[in-house]
Every structure is written in structure tokens, then in C-alpha cells.
Amino acid sequence: VPITLIIIFGLFWTQSKGTGAVGFMFGPVMLVWFLILSMLGVYNIIQEPSVLLALNPIYAFNFFSSQFSVAFLTLGAVVLCVTGVESLYADMGHFGRNPIKVTWFSFVFPALTINYFGQGALILSDPSAIKNPFYLMAPEWMTLPLVIMATVATVIASQACITGAFSVSRQALQLGFIPRMRIDHTSENQEGQIYLPRVNWMLMIGVMSVVVIFQSSSALANAYGIAITLDMIIATILAGFVMHEIWKWKWRYTLAFLAVFLTIDIVFFLSNIIKVPSGGWFPLLVGIIFVFLISTWKKGRKILFKKTKKETMEIDYFFKEMKKIIKARVDGTAVFLTPNPDGVPHSLLHNLKHNKVLHKRVILLSVKFRDYPHANGENIISIKKLPNNFYKVILNYGYKDLTKIPQDLARNLKGTFSLDPMDTSYFVGKESLVIRSGKEMNFFRKTIFSYQFRTSENITNQFNLPVNRVVELGSKVVF
């Protein structure tokens, strides 16, 4: 356990430096790893070729018909075979579907299958090998090199999962499912190479906690079985939504797909239910906590938006009152960020209240994150000219887009007017929440949301605004 904790700490500690320097080694190392798996499997299959009879489904049928309860519970162990493949698709956001499909069907799937057959062959010839079939497949002199190679392969697989967690967290952040957090780009050449400090350290604490709680991989298997089968059920349901809503499949075809695959997934899940007391409780607890935190953030944001919208002044009324309030207009462009494109931002009203001046050109900017990966062409920006040299601008981003508001504004406003970066100021609101008991959300959840809101990343950093051109104007909101 201490060695494992040291390796885990080292892995997470190096994340901030990026993987570009050593990333070129990952492919060759994994290639060698899967070749070793294949060779070990082939060697043992040659020793006991009768294991190939397992390809005949009649054996599985006879097993279920003669010993149904034992066979059913065996499914809970069989599902653990996917532990060898989750790293392959964990980082799909970087590689795409086709490279992973080609790699899986042409190389990884055959290698893993051959190795599993090899382990079966070893157990058939020597039943005592069931205590550790993988390492006993190899000659004794090869045990240490195999342990080292397995450790390196595990670290690389873990790296794929960590990078995948960064990608998914960034997309969830852009879609508004989790609070804003700092995103560092670790590569000048690849946009996808990112590092999220908060996610990184939370993952490290979580992984270390798992190691301390479960102590061994065999004990962890109980937790893994519940986690992976629940993930399979969720993935199947989401696939059903994609088929009907995106691919426009008819309901009867979608339901036929769900009936087949959900039946398989649910059977595997039920076979793991007995593992809940002995470790399966852990992923369920983690899942419940994350659902609670995400739903609290989403609901809190919705309530906060409604409250601020209710108190927002309408643009038409503002223009009527504008002449009474404004004594002077100064040179330059002011960009006021607002979540509500149809009202006057609180930051603008606070600016007028304290400074009693307004820039000659004013942009009311709303940034919207859409449910598609990239915004391009006509759907990236919407511009509406308003009286008094005001502009209402909606800037759209996909959930995989990098947000660089100054550059994106300047590029997309070229046809309307020229935006001088040294003559443009950005005004952002900084709300401070005052918690009150209410019907919309209980006090405890409001306290959690207040903490999430208070510790979320500054909008200046999230939108890559020039720090020396940003003015923050604070206000209190009764929540």
C-alpha cells in the first residue's frame, strides 16, 4: 500500500507539467504490453488447447441450466474482464471514435482474449494456479520484469483516465453542470492538453482513499463491479436518447435496442448486487454525492438567475432614463458581461451609480455554451444594433471550444466596427450571496451552493479577459 500511494502521488503531482514530453512513449509501451499478453496467452493455450472448447456456447448454456444460481453469481466476476479496456476509451475526446475502434478490433481485443484463454488453459492444467493466474502464466524469471511492465502499463492507463476526466470536467463546466474552475493549457501545439488543478487533487485524494479503504485489488473488485455495470446501464440509456433524438430512429427500433442491451446490462448489475455490503457501497456513495453536488449547483444557478432577472431593468426603460442619469460619455468601448441578454446588466447600473459616465460605444455581451462541440460560421455570434450606440451581442461556444472573448469579439465584429483592444474595458459583476431560508431550496443546500459559488473560478480567468482591462463591480444578492 505505501508503494502504491507513492506512485499515485507521483502520477498526480506531474500532471501540471503535461504529458507532451513523455507522451510519445505511451503508444510503444502499450504495444509491447499487449504483445506480451498475447505471447503469454498463446504459450499456455498450446500447453492446454482444450480451453478453446470454451468458444462453444453450449457449455455456458449447460452451466446455467444445471447450476443457475452459481452461474448467475459468476457473471459478477466475468464483468471484471473489462478492467483491461476502460483506459482505451477513457480519453476518446482526444483521439476520436475511429482510431479507438480500429485499435480495439485489430489488436487490443484479440490480445486480451488470447490472454484470458491462456489463463483459463493454465487453470485447467494446474487448478492451484487460480490464486494468481496472470503472473503464474510466465516463467519464474519473468515475474519481476512482468510486474514492472504491468506497473508502467497501469500508470499509462491511469493517465488516460485522468486526461479523460480533465476533458469531461471541462465540457461539464462549459455546459454549466459544475462550478467554474481553473483550466491550464499544458501544450502550445495541442488545445486538448489541459490541466484542471482542482479536479486533479480531488481525484488524487479519492484514489488514495480507495487504496487505504480497500487495501488490495481483489477487495476493490467488489466496488468495481457495481461501478462498471451501473455505467453500462447509463451508457445504454444515453445511447437510446442519441438514437431517437439525434439519429432520428423510430421509437420501435430504439426500444428494441434498449430491450436487448438493457436486459444484458441489468442482468450483470443484479449479479453484482450482493457485493454492495462488501465494497459495492463505495461507488454508490460517490455517485450519490456527485449527483447531489451537481443538482445543487444547477438548481442554485437557476434560482439565482431568476432572482437577478426579476431585478433587472428593461433596456427600453433604461434608454428613457439614460439622459437624466448620464452627464458625459467618454471615448472607448465598454463591454458589460451579462447572463441575461434582454436586460441591463447590474454592473452597468453600478458603474453609472458610482461614476456617472458611460463609454461612447457599449456592448452588452452574453456568453452562451451550447450542446454541440464547436461553434462556427453563422452560429458563433449574434449582433443587434440598439439606440444610443449600444450593441447586444450573444457569443456562442461549443462545449469543447476554448473561450477567448477579446480575440473572438474582435474577429467576429470586424464587419460591424473595429474593436481596439487597448481602448476596450470589460465590466463584470461580482455577486455576494446573502442566504435566507426559502421554499425553492433548503438552507443546507443553499449553504453548499453558496460555497460552490464563492469558490468558483473568477470569470476573468475563465473567459481569458485581459486582467488590466477588467473592472469588477460587486453587489449583494439575497438568495
Write out the residue ranges for each language-model feature:
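The structured alpha-helical core of multi-pass membrane proteins
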Residues: 1-479
